[in-house]
Curated annotation (Swiss-Prot):
Source organism of the structure: Methylibium petroleiphilum (strain ATCC BAA-1232 / LMG 22953 / PM1)
Keyword Zinc set for record: no
Pfam family name, one: MscL
Any one of the GO CC terms: plasma membrane
TM ranges: 16-36, 83-103
Gene (UniProt): mscL
Purpose: Channel that opens in response to stretch forces in the membrane lipid bilayer. May participate in the regulation of osmotic pressure changes within the cell.
Family: Belongs to the MscL family.
Protein name: Large-conductance mechanosensitive channel
InterPro entries named in the record: Mechanosensitive_channel_CS, MS_channel, MSC/AndL, MscL_channel
Lineage of the organism: Bacteria, Pseudomonadati, Pseudomonadota, Betaproteobacteria, Burkholderiales
Amino acid sequence: MSFFSEFKEFAVKGNVIDLAVGVIIGGAFGKIVDSIVGDLIMPIVSKLFGGLDFSNYYVGLAGQAAGLPLAEAKKAGAVFAYGNFITVALNFAILAFIIFLMIKQINRLKKDEPAAPPAPPAEDIVLLREIRDALKK
């Protein structure tokens, strides 16, 4: 088998194509969920907590004056910028919850497929059972 025919066989298999479609749809879906979190949910969270913007929370490690914006504090020296981590962690928690709700809804809407009937036993198994039953008599 030539290299190209092997590659063609590999690339045309259903799993590879399914994976490619999943990656493309996942990328598009990620943008939708990012928009839901960033444009719809985070403004509500910010409003509930008095307009907090966690991204500017930091601890100055080089003796910066308190109250500087994060960008200026970084110019003045090293900072422990924990606020951005809080924002990303909160976004992740909201994102995970939204995805959980969506998957739960999708699973609820899926129709339960009836279980496949059990496969009949192989011929050798049937023969062995007949021999066993004959020996018991």
